Amino acid sequence: MKSVQFCFLFCCWRAICCRSCELTNITITVEKEECSFCISINTTWCAGYCYTRDLVYKDPARPNIQKACTFKELVYETVKVPGCAHHADSLYTYPVATECHCGKCDRDSTDCTVRGLGPSYCSFSDIRE
């Protein structure tokens, strides 16, 4: 019986601790209007689960803030998009997360929606690696 309890507690601990908010590698699609195609770039972003709850009774004095896995620290890197016209600005700057935490989603810098375009969206038909 104790081994069953231990296994249950171990599985719960693993589900909570090992799926926390952490840095992960992703591929994003970058596009420049002047270049008429997209390229894929590997970068680092935050992903994982954060403890959150939704109150049954809404209290106007206590705002309900859902925590999301988001960046705590960012740096920016710049890549040159190959094949652009000579008159076009071929440099593209993108964010790279260096530290993550569970916190309020900043709508000024992050797509906080459930149904965003996603990192692989390209408005052009030509995607280059």
Swiss-Prot record:
Q: Where in the cell is it found?
A: Secreted
Gene Ontology biological process terms in this record: estradiol secretion; follicle-stimulating hormone signaling pathway; G protein-coupled receptor signaling pathway; positive regulation of bone resorption; positive regulation of gene expression; positive regulation of steroid biosynthetic process; regulation of osteoclast differentiation; regulation of signaling receptor activity
Q: Which Gene3D superfamilies match?
A: Cystine-knot cytokines
Residue ranges of coiled coil: none
Q: Which domain of life is it from?
A: Eukaryota
InterPro entries given in the database record: Cystine-knot_cytokine, Glyco_hormone_CN, Gonadotropin_bsu, Gonadotropin_bsu_CS
Glycosylation sites per record:
25, 42
Which pairs of positions does the record mark as disulfide bonds?
21-69, 35-84, 38-122, 46-100, 50-102, 105-112
Which keywords accompany this UniProt record? Answer: Disulfide bond, Glycoprotein, Hormone, Secreted, Signal
Matches recorded under SUPFAM superfamilies: Cystine-knot cytokines
SMART domains linked: GHB
Molecular function terms, GO-annotated: follicle-stimulating hormone activity
In Pfam terms, one family for this protein is Cys_knot
**CC terms in the record's Gene Ontology section:** cytoplasm; extracellular space; follicle-stimulating hormone complex
Role this protein plays = Together with the alpha chain CGA constitutes follitropin, the follicle-stimulating hormone, and provides its biological specificity to the hormone heterodimer. Binds FSHR, a G protein-coupled receptor, on target cells to activate downstream signaling pathways. Follitropin is involved in follicle development and spermatogenesis in reproductive organs.
Quaternary structure, from the entry = Heterodimer. The active follitropin is a heterodimer composed of an alpha chain/CGA shared with other hormones and a unique beta chain/FSHB shown here.
UniProt lists the family membership as follows: Belongs to the glycoprotein hormones subunit beta family.
Q: What is this protein called?
A: Follitropin subunit beta
Query: What's the encoding gene here?
Result: FSHB
